Design a protein with these regions (language model features):
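Phosphate-end processing signature that detects enzymes handling 5′-triphosphorylated RNA
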Residues: 13-277
Length: 277
């Protein structure tokens, strides 16, 4: 993209985002998302203390599957890891393993100055695949126009990383816009890239770790602030997709760079060669 054109595009998007309000009925969400890394003991203690002002989601623990789209050179996640003022991600999400007729969600997640703006549309897995991979036309809405622009702007977007995890969610009793989620058993893979393939892959976190996210359109309750302070729990910029990408990148580097010393066998002779990459 020409630099000036990219700059103008970002200015336009930022202008649009500043004007938006929360419109849940249109599946557009605006909120701040703050992440914390806890151990299991801390998570259980917090859940117990939250009972006085939070209620558990009616679905209990859910399994979430997210298929992230990116360019062949991982432009979207690389850009996100640079911590720019504005960034975006495109993903396809299901609750549990999908089949072709399962309702899934195409999500475009944008972030500007720590505020998250998420758009999503529901369709079957088969429809979503034909829409995202083969650009089959769907009903035109403001959300689909933005997704279409993303598909056009970033050339050759395709499934890049599959993530799955178990999530337990809680809502504030007096404000359903305030949510807290706990994610465990986070798995990733960069093969079998489909929501229909099942839940498996490599673990991102130790079994004792829990990723907590606070999602709010306003302030964090004082009880929550006190708990975090007393337990010395601090916010983190942890990203599931970025963590998976770092592993992918490290492995690609190892494959392209031979070890510093290796041996070549020629009959009875062993020749040691020092190779530096």
């Amino acid at each position: 993209i020409i630099p000036n054109l990219q700059l103008n595009l970002e200015r336009y998007v930022i202008h649009r985002l500043r004007k938006e309000t929360l419109m849940a009925d249109q599946m557009i969400f605006k909120r701040c998302e703050i992440k914390y890394m806890l151990d299991i003991t801390q998570a259980e203690l917090l859940k117990n203390q939250m009972k006085q002002y939070m209620t558990a989601d009616e679905h209990g623990v859910s399994t979430i599957c997210s298929l992230y789209f990116d360019t062949p050179d991982y432009l979207l996640i690389q850009r996100s890891m640079e911590h720019p003022v504005y960034k975006e991600k495109l993903r396809l999400r299901s609750y549990g393993t999908a089949d072709k007729d399962t309702t899934v969600f195409v999500e475009l997640k944008k972030k500007y100055e720590s505020v998250v703006y998420k758009r999503r549309i529901a369709m079957t897995e088969d429809e979503a695949e034909r829409y995202l991979l083969f650009h089959e036309k769907v009903k035109v809405t403001q959300i689909t126009r933005e997704i279409d622009y993303c598909l056009k702007n970033y050339k050759k977007l395709a499934p890049a990383v599959m993530l799955s995890y178990e999530r337990e969610a809680f809502y504030a009793k007096d404000d359903h816009e305030f949510r807290i989620t706990f994610d465990q058993n986070i798995l990733w893979r960069n093969y079998d890239l489909s929501l229909c393939k099942g839940i498996y892959g490599e673990a991102i976190l130790d079994k004792n770790k829990v990723l907590m996210e606070v999602k709010t359109a306003g302030a964090i309750p004082l009880l929550m602030v006190h708990f975090l302070t007393e337990n010395q729990i601090y916010k983190t910029s942890f990203s599931k997709y970025a963590t998976a990408y770092r592993t992918i990148y490290a492995r690609e580097q190892r494959r392209s760079c031979p070890p510093e010393n290796f041996f070549v066998f020629t009959g009875d002779e062993v020749v040691q060669q020092a190779i530096k990459c």
